Regions:
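Extended, composition-driven regions rather than compact fold-specific motifs
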Residues: 1-412
C-alpha cells in the first residue's frame, strides 16, 4: 500500500471511529460486549473494545461486579453442547468434529478478552481488570471460572518468549525508578537516596522482565549484590556506609530481593526464568563469579513455631529451628510449608545455610526472629535438584543444614 493510500485509509478509519463512538453512547456495556463478540470489521471491533475499556476504567466497584457476573454467567460454556460435540468427536475423530468440540469448550469470555486486547494499551488494562477480580473472587467463588480463563490467557500472552530482560540502573527513566520504589516487596526502599544505594554502586545490579505491550511497567525485578563470599546479614549487605568493591573482584552474586509487580498477574510465574537468565548473563559478563545464592526471608517460620510440637529445650536455637522448618515442615501434598522455599527449591536451588540475626528489621523479627537463609543456585545441578524436588519431594540441602535440622528435639 502506498503512503497516500495509507493516509486516506487512516483518515477514513478515524472518521468512521467517530461515527461508531457516537453510536455506542446509548448502549449499555453488556450490549457493547455482545456487539464486540459479533463484530467482523477491524475498525468497528477496535472502537467497541475501546468504548468498553473506557467505561470499565470509571466503573464503581458494584458496576465492576455486575460486569464480572455478566462475563461469568452469560458468556459461559453450554455443558450439554460440549458433551454433544465430544460424543461426535469420539464417534468420528476428524478436524471438523475436533474443531466443533474445541469451540464449544471455550467460553465466549475468552474471545471477549482477546477482542478487548485489540486496543493499544489494553493488555495493561486487562491486567488491572484481573487485579480487581481477584479482590472479589474470594468472597464470590462463582466468579472463579472467569479468573481461570483470564489466567489461562495471560499465561499465553506473558510467556517467556515475549518477555524482555532489561537492566535497571540509576540512569533508568524516572518513572521506572519510581515503580521500583513502589513495588519493592521484600526490603522497603524508603527514599531516593536509599534507591541510589541499591542501584548506583559498581557492585550492585537490578534486572526486570518487561512485556512489549507494557514497556513502562516491570512485571518482576530482582536486586543483586556482587560480593566476596556469601553474606549472612541483610543489614551488612545494605549498610549505608559500606565500601563498594569492583564488580570484577566479586566471586558471588547474591539475589537478595525479588519482587512481583503486577497483582493482576498473580499465579503467572516469572521468577524461575528471571533468576536463571540473570545468573547466566552475569556469569558471561563477570567470569570471576563462581557462586550464585540468595539471601532470603523465611516468612512462615514464626507462625509454624506457634503450632509445632517442639520440645522447650529448642528455644533460642534459631538456626536449628529454621533449618528444621525448611527441611521438615510440609503441606499435605509434601511440598514445603514455606512459600519462598517452594519457589527457590522448585527452581532447582538447594538450602545452603541459615543465619540468625540476619534481618533485625521489625518485619524480619516478626516473621522469623530475624533468621534468613541462603539458597544456592549451582548452575550445574539445577536440573537434577529440580527433578528431585518436583518428582520425589526431596529438599536438597547442605550437610551443615541437615545437621542443624537433626539437632531439633520433638515432643514425645
Amino acid at each position: 500500500m502506498s503512503f497516500f493510500s495509507e493516509l486516506v485509509s487512516t483518515i477514513f478509519e478515524r472518521r468512521y471511529q467517530k461515527v461508531l463512538l457516537k453510536e455506542t453512547e446509548g448502549k449499555t456495556t453488556v450490549e457493547l460486549a455482545d456487539a464486540l463478540l459479533g463484530s467482523i470489521g477491524e475498525v468497528s471491533g477496535v472502537t467497541l473494545a475501546r468504548s468498553i475499556l473506557d467505561r470499565y476504567a470509571i466503573m464503581s466497584s458494584n458496576e465492576k461486579l455486575d460486569f464480572f457476573e455478566f462475563m461469568t454467567d452469560k458468556l459461559e460454556i453450554d455443558p450439554e453442547y460440549v458433551i454433544k460435540t465430544l460424543d461426535a468427536f469420539k464417534i468420528n475423530p476428524n478436524k471438523a468434529t475436533y474443531q466443533a468440540f474445541a469451540e464449544a469448550s471455550e467460553p465466549k469470555r475468552q474471545e471477549l478478552a482477546r477482542r478487548l486486547n485489540q486496543v493499544p494499551g489494553a493488555t495493561a488494562q486487562l491486567v488491572k481488570l484481573r487485579k480487581d477480580l481477584l479482590g472479589m473472587v474470594k468472597d464470590r467463588p462463582k466468579l472463579g471460572p472467569l479468573d481461570v480463563d483470564l489466567k489461562h490467557l495471560f499465561a499465553s500472552w506473558f510467556n517467556r518468549g515475549f518477555l524482555v530482560l532489561r537492566p535497571i540502573n540509576w540512569s533508568s527513566p524516572a518513572d521506572i525508578l519510581e515503580k521500583i520504589i513502589a513495588y519493592e516487596a521484600v526490603h522497603a526502599i524508603h527514599s531516593w537516596d536509599d534507591l541510589r544505594l541499591r542501584l548506583k554502586p559498581t557492585d550492585r545490579r537490578c534486572f526486570g522482565f518487561f512485556h512489549p505491550s507494557m514497556p513502562d511497567e516491570p512485571l518482576i525485578f530482582v536486586e543483586v549484590a556482587l560480593t566476596k563470599g556469601i553474606p549472612n546479614s541483610i543489614q551488612e549487605l545494605l549498610a549505608d556506609e559500606r565500601d563498594p568493591i569492583n564488580a570484577a573482584d566479586a566471586d558471588t552474586a547474591v539475589f537478595y530481593s525479588i519482587s512481583n509487580c503486577q497483582a493482576g498477574l498473580a499465579g503467572i510465574s516469572f521468577g524461575n526464568s528471571l533468576i536463571k537468565q540473570v545468573a547466566s548473563d552475569l556469569a558471561t559478563d563477570l567470569p570471576g563469579l563462581s557462586t550464585f545464592v540468595t539471601l532470603s526471608p523465611i516468612p512462615g517460620l514464626n507462625r509454624w513455631l506457634e503450632t509445632s510440637k517442639l520440645a522447650n529445650e529448642n528455644l533460642g536455637q534459631d538456626e536449628a529451628l529454621a533449618a528444621h522448618y525448611l527441611l521438615k515442615a510440609k503441606k499435605p501434598d509434601g511440598m514445603p510449608l514455606d512459600p519462598v522455599a517452594r519457589f527457590h527449591l522448585g527452581n532447582g536451588a538447594k538450602v545452603h545455610a541459615v543465619h540468625a540475626q540476619a534481618d533485625t528489621s521489625e518485619n524480619g523479627v516478626e516473621q522469623s526472629n530475624g533468621t534468613m537463609v541462603n539458597y544456592l543456585y549451582d548452575l550445574s545441578q539445577i536440573s537434577q535438584n529440580h527433578e528431585k524436588f518436583v518428582g520425589e519431594r526431596i529438599v536438597v540441602a547442605s550437610a551443615p543444614v541437615k545437621t542443624l535440622s537433626a539437632s531439633v528435639k520433638i515432643k514425645v
